[in-house]
């Protein structure tokens, strides 16, 4: 279980989050909905160690986590809104780059793990493909596989249905629900309330500041 207590974050004069509290039960989907400016994406970025946390407390399974070491903790694997796949790298190369550089995996170890994830997500035939040749749904799954390469405790999705047509939106919904059946803990931030209601065990609404 993940518990956030009185988390605060400010960018310059703008208060993004103020004494924010959140409880994320293990193996469940927590959806956070609300308009832009409510701090949803910033929250995910902080949990992934991509932004600093000004103040507050993070407790995971009873352990107080240092706020300045979340990136090394691999607490959250981040699936970016725009996927952020490297266009000059193949699917396989996108997946193995970070584990080799940051986790001291050998190329053989990383490639084996990546192929296992691609098979699980139905992408094994696209291992040598480049991002430009993939559909939106396929890119989403590659981004998920990349997030899973670091063995995170939690997967976080930033606006996973943004700019997707209804068919691909349903595909993403099924993928997230399948991951719950596999025991994954997931946080989804979105402005798409019907989508959030379809997937969430816990639904939290935030307002813009």
Where are the predicted features?
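Conserved ABC transporter NBD signature motif
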Residues: 56-64
């Amino acid at each position: 279980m993940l518990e956030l207590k009185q988390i605060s974050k400010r960018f310059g004069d703008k208060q993004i989050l103020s004494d924010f509290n959140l409880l994320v039960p293990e193996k469940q989907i927590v959806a956070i909905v609300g308009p832009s400016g409510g701090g949803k994406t910033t929250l995910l970025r902080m949990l992934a160690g991509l932004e600093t946390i000004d103040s507050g407390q993070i407790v995971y399974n009873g352990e107080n986590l240092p706020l300045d070491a979340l990136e090394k903790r691999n607490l959250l694997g981040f699936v970016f809104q725009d996927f952020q796949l490297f266009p000059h790298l193949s699917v396989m190369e996108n997946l193995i780059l970070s584990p080799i550089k940051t986790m001291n995996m050998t190329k053989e170890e990383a490639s084996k793990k990546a192929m296992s994830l691609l098979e699980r997500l139905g992408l094994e035939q696209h291992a040598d493909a480049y991002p430009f040749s993939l559909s939106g749904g396929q890119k989403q799954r590659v981004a998920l596989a990349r997030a899973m390469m670091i063995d995170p405790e939690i997967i976080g999705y930033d606006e996973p249905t943004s700019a997707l047509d209804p068919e691909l939106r349903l595909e993403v919904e099924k993928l997230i629900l399948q991951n719950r059946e596999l025991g994954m803990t997931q946080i989804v931030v979105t402005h798409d309330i019907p989508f959030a209601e379809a997937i969430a065990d816990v639904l939290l609404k935030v307002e813009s500041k």
